[in-house]
A protein has these predicted regions:
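Regulatory cytosolic signal-relay segments
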Residues: 1-38, 65
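Generic alpha-helical secondary structure signal
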Residues: 7-8, 55, 138
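Bulky hydrophobic/aromatic packing residues
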Residues: 8, 12, 60, 69-70, ...
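Residue-level signal for alpha-helical context at structural boundaries
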Residues: 18, 22, 69-72, 163
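Residue-level detector of functional hotspots within protein domains
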Residues: 27-29, 34-37, 70, 78, ...
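Catalytic NTP-binding/metal-coordinating core of nucleotidyl cyclase/transferase enzymes
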Residues: 31-105
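Catalytic beta-strand-to-alpha-helix segment of the class III nucleotidyl cyclase homology domain
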Residues: 93-171
Length: 171
């Protein structure tokens, strides 16, 4: 039975791959560039500082619980127009059309001094929006900015610093 199941599965997968290669995958074709939407957004990445050490100290299951609480605290504190678009491990990607509002959120989130500490990086620009997610150079830059943040820090690009809300200053 195992042999036939493996052979059937392989044939089924190969058949689907051939259909997709021939362009017959249920009528869905890859999106043309002009079907993608460019939108001006602020993109933030927030992750837990010292997550590797945390998993070693607490174990995987408790570390996952910590990540779930972290992401829930992000989602519950976001301005109404912002949202968590995805999580990757201990990192959350947050997007908002309101750049000053996302800056205010990042600063206030870090002021909470949660443990373990977060690192947040922000950038803004024209990103590609496709099927509920954001892509492109601006998103990649936001991710790299977050990687430069230390525990408890918010690091922004020059573009974001120029658009910061009144009352917020950056060193």
């Amino acid at each position: 039975h195992q042999y036939y199941l493996r052979v059937f599965t392989e044939q089924d997968v190969i058949g689907h791959m051939e259909e997709l290669a021939a362009g017959a995958g249920g009528g869905e074709q890859p999106k043309e560039r002009d079907e993608l939407t460019r939108v001006r957004v602020a993109v933030a990445f927030a992750d837990l500082a010292g997550y590797t050490r945390l998993t070693e100290e607490l174990g995987d299951a408790r570390a996952v619980d910590t990540v779930e609480r972290f992401v829930a605290s992000i989602a519950s504190s976001l301005p109404s127009e912002a949202r968590v678009t995805k999580t990757i491990g201990d990192e959350a990607m947050i997007v908002s059309p309101d750049i000053p509002a996302l800056v205010r959120w990042a600063v206030s989130f870090q002021a909470q001094e949660i443990e373990p500490s977060a690192r947040i990086g922000l950038h803004c620009g024209q990103a590609l929006f496709y099927e509920g997610d954001y892509y492109g150079r601006e998103v990649n830059l936001a991710s790299r900015v977050a990687a430069r943040a230390a525990a408890g820090e918010v690091v922004v690009t020059g573009t974001v610093a120029e658009l910061k809300p009144p009352g917020v200053s950056f060193d």
